[in-house]
Amino acid sequence: MAKSPARRCTAKVRRVLSRSVLILCWSLLGAAPAHADDSRLGWPLRPPPAVVRQFDAASPNWNPGHRGVDLAGRPGQPVYAAGSATVVFAGLLAGRPVVSLAHPGGLRTSYEPVVAQVRVGQPVSAPTVIGALAAGHPGCQAAACLHWGAMWGPASGANYVDPLGLLKSTPIRLKPLSSEGRTLHYRQAEPVFVNEAAAGALAGAGHRKSPKQGVFRGAAQGGDIVARQPPGRWVCPSSAGGPIGWHRQ
């Protein structure tokens, strides 16, 4: 029995949709990570240094904590910009020499104690030497320590994050995530982020972006990573039936 024109049309539409879903999956799993990794951070000391003190998030923000990592170095060692940015501070802060950089997407990184070799307003990139490491960081057990910090937002209301979670050497993959209201719970006990480059790659793969903000912010809570979403969110169909997002693996 011959199929009616309506049924033939429906079957054709289904085939086209199936191919579209396959293309979406390949672009999501293949292209997006490569673009995202291009904008992740590099080590500010070379070769990659020993981490002598880890990040310890304060909760809430005004409580004591360690809002960065301490990296072992030597006095006078060159300190590099961790990525493309603009210098927003270079000088003394509370008697300590500090350099602060603003990266695309709202991320800021800070470096201390560093005697600046750059000026405010100067654009820098990963190969740029921004200053020389000085001795005297409190609690440092090495000849000198670089305190490297990272934060989202302005200093007055900054959300401090572990800069080690932003390094290019940290592999990232796409995985389906469980959702509870407007909070995504990640299985890994480390920070997770979506930066502007990753956001652009995901948008190219058919995702929707918040009109106000394209960044997930992560924080460790009870062994889970909880990424609170901005208004709107990135969403994409998955075989697990949940949204897909970035996380460390």
Curated annotation (Swiss-Prot):
Keywords: Signal. It holds the Pfam family Peptidase_M23. Residues 227-249 are annotated as: Disordered. CDD domains: M23_peptidase. GO terms for molecular function: metalloendopeptidase activity. Transmembrane segments: none annotated. Residues 1-36 form the signal peptide. PANTHER family: L-ALA--D-GLU ENDOPEPTIDASE (PTHR21666:SF289), PEPTIDASE-RELATED (PTHR21666). This is Uncharacterized protein Mb2915. It comes from Mycobacterium bovis (strain ATCC BAA-935 / AF2122/97).
